Amino acid sequence: MRALFSSPAADTAGQQEALAVPLARLRFAAPLAALLGVMHTLAFAPNRWWWLQILSLAGLAALVRQAPRLRDVAWVGYAFGLGWFLSGIWWLYISMHVYGDMPAWMAAAAVLLFSAYLALHPALAAWLWQRLARGRQLSGAASALVFGAAWLVSEWLRGTEWTGFPWLNGGYAHTDGPLAGYAPLVGVYGVVAIAATLAGLLCAAAERRLHWLAGLAGVAVLAAGWPLHTIAWTQPVGKPITVRLLQGNVPQDVKFQQTGIDHSLALYTKMVTEQPAQLVVTPETAFPILLQDMPQEIALAIRTYVDTTGSSVLFGAANADSAVDYTNSAFGVGPWFKGVYRYDKHHLVPFGEFIPFGFHWFVHMMNMPLGDFRRGLPVQPPMPVAGQRVAPNICYEDLFGEEIAASLRQAERPATMLANVTNLAWFGDTIALDQHLQISRMRALESGRPMLRATNTGATAVVRPDGSVQARLPVFTLGTLQADVQGMQGLTPFVRTGNAPALGAGVLVLLAALARRRRAGAA
């Protein structure tokens, strides 16, 4: 493996010259690391190759260990990140160029720059691991633990800094694997820490640095996920309710034009009132107008439907509390409460729902209905429906499992089911739709609750509390998904504690490695 970083002549010149290999000698290692990053992306939906996530990280660990200098270590991690994110979030180009009318070169440059920023995090993880573990005679198992902790901290930083972008967190690749059993215990960050540690063990085993007991422990941790997955951390409450999830398949390029607005208003009014159900859910901004501008005949049709059938309706629309105070909201009407239920989106999308300081010029390059919205409260009451309590979240809010967990544990009466309303038409018929469904499946696993997904173009689905998909509609089709859904009560260990145990354990491992390094240096 060292040949990837140095020439044969450098090897014969001895260890000292090998450490002085210039950055140009990474010409083989960096592309290989980028290829491993692409392999990492392939582990995610629509594939179910959870094992590839571990293998690709093990390959990265092997490359990193052979890098002669710490700066080379960081470059290898960075190349891995570029391959990972360019292959995993390329669909952002579609929203900016196809629907935002941004010049192709500028949209491509924006995706490249964003991926370059995200790639700093695996570079940090690789550098931190080797900074603490290199040359300290750590056992293979101890080194693997430090790798897992470094990867955990870097992923947590990516998911929190600058409002966070935790898309493609490695833990999501394991919704169909044995490590899914750990999600109700430690959440997605705990899962990715376990996966990275297993990758470190695999790397150590390949290099014959792993004691057989440590290898056996790794196999046991992996295998234990299956029986953990069978544990019911939450319990059924009340009777199942009949839900209808609407998928209007309204083209994004006309959705906010007058013809598209008229089409959406007529379409969703018809779909909502077609037949009774205890709960009907529309996608995000299904009614692409302000609630205050809702035509009276549509409001009357929905109210009449609710009053005559006993159904409840949760629908998406924007709201204006004043001329400068807008929210992206979900509204509910039903027989189980007075007035209109309202949920305001709390975690807003940068550039889509708020514009970071200094970036108005960038937004002006796109022909999109973007602006600054006000964020909702972090904890909002669920919507009561036929003995159940439904907690909405809007668009990519379901990427933030800690926020959903906090809303459940801090609520007076926690929700018994979750509902994600979204519009991913911005990203075309791409892997983004399957990736987002996989994220919702992880939220169901973490919370022990069903997740209802009503989307404009897909993937509209019902997810069981164990993360499996109960039913779904084909993407980019017009349709209604009807299912009976059982609400769940009780709090999983992850909901009770959030990310604190996993993150705390990772920080402790890094501090222990740092203390050992300082003691060794003092000696």
UniProtKB/Swiss-Prot annotation:
InterPro entries: Apolipo_AcylTrfase, C-N_Hydrolase, C-N_Hydrolase_sf, LNT_N. It is found in: Cell inner membrane. Its main location: membrane. Keywords: Acyltransferase, Cell inner membrane, Cell membrane, Membrane, Transferase, Transmembrane, Transmembrane helix. It holds the Pfam family LNT_N. GO terms for molecular function: N-acyltransferase activity. The keyword Transmembrane helix applies. Pathway: Protein modification; lipoprotein biosynthesis (N-acyl transfer). GO terms for biological process: lipoprotein biosynthetic process. Its EC number is 2.3.1.269. It is a multi-pass membrane protein. The active site is at residues 284, 345, 395. The chain crosses the membrane at residues 26-46, 49-66, 74-94, 109-129, 137-157, 185-205, 212-232, 494-514. The keyword Membrane applies. Catalyzes the phospholipid dependent N-acylation of the N-terminal cysteine of apolipoprotein, the last step in lipoprotein maturation. Belongs to the CN hydrolase family. Apolipoprotein N-acyltransferase subfamily. This is Apolipoprotein N-acyltransferase. It comes from Ralstonia nicotianae (strain ATCC BAA-1114 / GMI1000) (Ralstonia solanacearum).
